[in-house]
């Protein structure tokens, strides 16, 4: 489905499950992003403020696609005037989960962010949370996406997460 349908679905899902999406949960972090351009706090805010509303049992039912769509819906709500967004972006190295590229004519132009989500079931959580850094194969995967973007858009500053 296209991005509009994904947003409609996520909005419906949030209402159906009484997931609170008010601005107080998110706006302060997005304002800070405007000043420092650090994506990690946006991801942390998403996990704590959005996913943190779900009961633990839900996490065995949701998948990586849900994570991508709900993250897209939240980020695009606050940054759509600065970035264009792509979910499952095709490139020569594969399909990146989430990409956001600065819109020409804005201060964000040439800013490109690549995010690769890795979803693990509860039984693998302890092992994954004990890692101090990403697995090398995951790093190489994202670097491949970044290199592809740099080839297509050499003037872009590609940041990975």
Where in this protein do the model-derived segments appear?
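Extended alpha-helical interface modules used as scaffolds for assembling large macromolecular complexes
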Residues: 1-120, 125-126, 135
